[in-house]
């Protein structure tokens, strides 16, 4: 265990070769962008249209006055930093290299990328619904279970409100996203990106689309989120007390491609650590997801296969990270064995 912990980015004195990525795969972001700031306290019609506009343009939305108080956000940042500031020996009891194990600390990202690792340590927690029971979470720091549990409940509430607004804007019944489609356990990734000795050769997370329904990101104050846009990459500048929400692959399937899950990645920097918290709104594994009839017509036939979420996850795990959603679940894909 000590040997493994010493190889995590937090404790490494130099970059292990497995964390160094080929330079030709690290196209730098060229533009600093502030995503449109959507004030959720404004009129409902205005907010709904702004969410649709930003979601269609970027696949991401940024919201303020979202209902989670500034003190709650500060408590969340504080307890997450407190966890990663603990001595290595205290964190070691929560560390696991077993990808099937939940409520664990791991390093290098959970993506299958042919042995490549990424400059990140992650505390991954499962928030069960409807109980919200956090007894299986780390018992240190003392306030972690209470603070992260309270925040996660609120973050899920923000996601459900945005999904209701999308229903209104897309002509879906108001409860379309209530039930199994959003009823899996919330997966909470508390991401710690240490300063990198070589940001030009490391990434915190590789380019990817989230395979959930929707992700709520507490972005932190240090830039690092980059999103694919018009053939390049743009840097997203953090806005105080905001949340950044992006559409997952399941939402793309439901809308038959009308809303897109957009690739994004996490850049590293030399100067200071970055902390962010991603809350993934996940369907139940046995939930069957396919294009909704509202998005299918004779002129616009289904573009995606209808699969259980469990089937989708298995297919996604065996596909190379650079593959697009079309190679995974496009109904016209003729590849064998996926």
Swiss-Prot record:
Tissues expressing this chain: Expressed in roots, but not in leaves.
Catalytic activity field: mugineate + 2-oxoglutarate + O2 = 3-epihydroxymugineate + succinate + CO2 + H(+); 2'-deoxymugineate + 2-oxoglutarate + O2 = 3-epihydroxy-2'-deoxymugineate + succinate + CO2 + H(+)
Name recorded for this polypeptide: Mugineic-acid 3-dioxygenase
Transmembrane portions of the chain: none
Top-level class of the enzyme under EC nomenclature: oxidoreductase
Cofactor note: Binds 1 Fe(2+) ion per subunit.
Listed EC numbers: 1.14.11.25
Induction context: Up-regulated by manganese and zinc deficiency or by excess NaCl. Down-regulated by iron.
Keywords attached to this entry: Dioxygenase, Iron, Metal-binding, Oxidoreductase, Vitamin C
Positions bound to Fe cation: 208, 210, 264
Protein family per UniProt: Belongs to the iron/ascorbate-dependent oxidoreductase family.
Functional note: Involved in the biosynthesis of mugineic acid family of phytosiderophores. May be involved in boron tolerance.
Keyword Metal-binding: yes
Domain Fe2OG dioxygenase: 180-283
Cofactor (UniProt): Fe(2+); L-ascorbate
Pfam families xrefs: 2OG-FeII_Oxy, DIOX_N
Binding site for 2-oxoglutarate: 274
InterPro entries assigned to the protein according to its UniProt record, in alphabetical order: DIOX_N (IPR026992), IPNS-like_FE2OG_OXY (IPR044861), IPNS-like_sf (IPR027443), Oxoglu/Fe-dep_dioxygenase_dom (IPR005123), Plant_2OG-oxidoreductases (IPR050295)
Disulfide bridge positions per record: none
Organism from which the protein derives: Hordeum vulgare (Barley)
Any one GO molecular-function label of the UniProt entry: L-ascorbic acid binding
